[in-house]
Regions:
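An N-terminal hydrophobic leader/cap segment in hydrolases
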Residues: 14-75
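A short loop-to-beta-strand scaffold at the N-terminal edge of the catalytic core in hydrolase folds
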Residues: 78-89
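Feature marks short, highly hydrophobic, charge-poor N-terminal signal-anchor/signal peptide-like helices
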Residues: 1-14
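Histidine-centered divalent metal-coordination motifs
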Residues: 84, 101-102, 133
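Short beta-strand element of the alpha/beta-hydrolase
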Residues: 94-102
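Serine-hydrolase catalytic-loop signature spanning alpha/beta hydrolases and amidase-signature enzymes
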Residues: 102-110, 125
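Conserved alpha/beta-hydrolase
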Residues: 118-137
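Catalytic nucleophile-loop/oxyanion-hole region of alpha/beta-hydrolase
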Residues: 107, 131-148
Length: 148
């Protein structure tokens, strides 16, 4: 076997490893599989010891949020996905706070306490469910890049 055959095999192997690593990183970081839609008596609470002390408070806020009236709004993204948000009106023609949830989160889980704070300031609220979360379409989170 010539030296250039070995070099080609090494280069092809490295290329394969590069693409395999890229795919694995994408899958672990950006891909979001089947989304769970929670029933009326179920609550989305993050896992981990750091959240245990706040569990009752998070459930309380999510219950309160579910009792508020809101208007469901949606837009269609450039790549033809339906993206949803909920508009909560506190005071007509007043300040609007637009809230976005965190990584692999949802508006209900991450922002239910924010509604209470915003309403205390007489602010209206738009809670956005970014792509691949809650009701919004998609399976890949883009950290808001494609929602601009």
């Amino acid at each position: 076997m010539q030296w250039y055959h070995i070099l080609i095999i090494i280069l092809l192997s490295l290329t394969f490893l590069f693409f395999l690593t890229t795919f694995i990183c994408y899958f672990l970081t950006f891909f979001i599989g089947k989304k769970k839609i929670y029933a009326k008596n179920e609550y989305d609470i993050p896992f981990g010891k750091e959240y245990e002390q706040y569990k009752d408070l998070m459930i309380k806020w999510q219950k309160e949020m579910r009792e508020l009236s809101y208007k469901q709004v949606q837009i269609t993204s450039f790549d033809n996905l339906k993206l949803y948000a909920r508009y909560y009106e506190c005071t007509e023609d007043h300040v609007l706070e637009i809230m976005f949830h965190g990584y692999r989160g949802s508006a209900e889980r991450d922002l239910s306490g924010g509604i209470k704070r915003a309403f205390a300031l007489n602010h209206n609220v738009l809670l956005v469910d970014q792509r691949a979360s809650s009701l919004s379409d998609g399976h890949t989170t883009t950290f808001g890049v494609n929602e601009r």
